[in-house]
Amino acid sequence: ANAVLPFLNNLWTTTLTGAQFKEALEQQWQTDADGNVPSRPYLQLGLSHNVSYTYDPNAAQGNHITSVTVNGKPLDLKREYRIGSFSFLLQGGDNFRAFAAGKDTKDTGLVDRDAWIDYISKNSPLKPRYDRRAVAVTGIPAGGKVTAGTSFDLQFSKLTLTSLGVPAETK
């Protein structure tokens, strides 16, 4: 457990608007507070199984995320969402400054490693999910607007997982 969660962060919750959550997803393409690209230019967030998004890896900074769904519905930029994560991230760690803008932030008192061990002991054997939550899509028309009678080509990538033990795609 310590090899996977070595930092002993507490689990916190906070409330973000949809716009703030989308901004946090944008911050996976890293810049520091001064706008400089750090030594790790991309850090992908782990997300709950009910959240997915598409992105354009070639887009300008701040414009990578092209769609987000929560529970199969489009993210409402004005709605508030309650999220949970590690205290380090919700304080803006690893350049995820959008998380620090959350409100009504609460410390659950649970340590990440201990909660993970407890979850595994209560839910074993675990069944991993192999679905993608982030898919790269390029070729989306500027502004996301499509005019009737016109055509365009979309390219999709990052459709399959490449981790050790993931079953081969059959479709």
Task: Please name every model-derived segment.
Residues 1-171:
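Feature captures C-terminal
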